[in-house]
Amino acid sequence: MPNSSYYDDDGGSFEAASYPFQFDGSRRFPNDLHPTMFEGEESNQNGGSVLIDQAFQDIQNPNVNSNMHLENQFQHFHEPNKESGAFGSYKNDDVAKEIESSKNQETDAKSEQAPFTEDASSSNYAHHRSADSQTKSALPPNVPASSSPLPPMSIAMNIARKRSWPASLAIERDNTADALFSTEDGREEQFNLEGVKTKSGRKVHRPNHFDPLVKLPTRRRGPGRRPVVALAMKCSVCQRLQSPPKNRIVFCDGCNTPFHQLCHEPYISDELLDSPNGEWFCDDCIRRKKQAPLVTGTTARELNLSSEEKKSYLLSLPISQLVDILLFCEQLHPDIPFYSPKTSTIVQELQSKRSAFTATMNEPVTGDQYLSLNNGTESQSKTTKHSTSLPSTEPVEVDKQYMESEKIPTIDEYLQEYSNEDEIVLQVLESFPAAVSFSTITNTIQAKYSNRKIKNSNITRSLNRLVRKNRVLRDARGSSYELNRTFDADRPSVRPDISITGPIPIDWMLYTPHTEDLTENFCTYYMFDETPIVLSSI
């Protein structure tokens, strides 16, 4: 349109103060463009007569008139300072780069569009041809005619924008990003796409949506490692793994069940464990061997057994069944010489010992007598527990070696080894006729019971406990203690739920038979260390 004006006059007056120009003082590049791009010469000027900024001072007529043609102004735009690197010269590298980028964008856009041909006779075709001719005539000589020119205002704004942005915000936007941001009508919209940077340099990531069909990776757990060896060494009674030297874990030679020496009933002796060829069977294995009936009826010749196999079989049988086999063989073959020449003498000695033992059982015994008798009876019971088929009137010889290994301590030895703090304090206070200080009590206990290693704090708690029970008297200052010799054994306790019968003889308290063999009439309740214990009297 050669006759169209560059600015259409709207007929109104122009006011510089109220002009809504977007590049005002808040623009980020105040050094390249003047804050006020347009200013009116007089109050009666309209928008068709304006002054251009310093970048466009090369135009001959600074006032763009509506009657002037646009191409005449562009012809003289680049003439002054043609060879210099001024802002208005096309020799400037930034301007050349901007024109080259616009050319590439125009070429890519044309290649993506479908081919379109217009009829030469149509009016639209003629109109576009005239507009293109005017645009080509307005291009500078060093710009190709095939390129699509940009208006001078757009070129200036793009150059100023790129120069004014800081280096941290000047993010290179490639063709892909421009294609994502641009729209068909030329406007730029900002989308929150994954992996796309905004103009300020911030990365925008799209939130991940929950998909119930997607299986999340799970951590695979390996096979559990259990200490099989350690569990196999656990005592079957107390369920502990510790095996101290004085209470070792022993495995049964029959069922391979582990037991502590003190946990198994009866106690497992150290001599049996120290012997290289010793075998030990638990009580369950011995009971099963007892209950198994003895089956006979076949000879070793028929089974073709060797001497070692015969010995192994006979050792597996309990003693009672072996005695029965010997008696049965004697009945079949009385001429077998398996008796000792001193058999009658041995039997008489055993009978005399047994009669003496049964005579003393009906007499009242003291602590020492009970110890000696208990030593003999326990040894006899251990050596004859499997000989149930023997006559009851024939005593069995006592194993002297077993008696020495199972020696029962005396009362003093027992107090030093197994008594608690309350018993020790009572014994010490009983040895003093008058009240003594706390230091005297502790020194006496440390000297007499040095192997126990009793702490002073335990002695203090024991004294306080005995004072509450009225067994020990303490003075008003709390510095001396004395045994309460007037303690009434028949007086009931202060606590209504427990009755105290007082101290009982030490022989009865330490060495008593099993309570399940006695009735309730022969038992008495004794509170020791604030715990009721049922003790039986003889």
UniProtKB/Swiss-Prot annotation:
PROSITE patterns reported for this sequence: ZF_PHD_1, ZF_PHD_2
Gene Ontology BP annotations: chromatin remodeling; heterochromatin boundary formation; negative regulation of gene expression, epigenetic; positive regulation of DNA-templated transcription
KW tRNA processing (keyword) present: no
Bias kind Polar residues: ranges: 367-392
Top-level taxonomic group: Eukaryota
One Pfam assignment: PHD
Keywords: Chromatin regulator, Metal-binding, Nucleus, Transcription, Transcription regulation, Zinc, Zinc-finger
Region listing for Disordered, in residue ranges: 28-47, 98-150, 198-222, 367-396
Localization per record: Nucleus
InterPro entries: Zinc_finger_PHD-type_CS, Znf_FYVE_PHD, Znf_PHD, Znf_PHD-finger, Znf_RING/FYVE/PHD
Residues in PHD-type zinc fingers: 232-288
GO cellular component, one term: nucleus
GO molecular function: chromatin binding; DNA binding; zinc ion binding
Biased composition (Basic and acidic residues): 98-111
Keyword Thylakoid: no
Function: Component of the SWM histone demethylase complex that specifically demethylates H3K9me2, a specific tag for epigenetic transcriptional activation, thereby acting as a corepressor. Has a role in regulating heterochromatin propagation and euchromatic transcription.
Subunit structure comment from the entry: Component of the SWM histone demethylase complex composed of at least lsd1, lsd2, phf1 and phf2.
The name this protein goes by in its record: SWM histone demethylase complex subunit phf2
Gene name tied to this protein: phf2
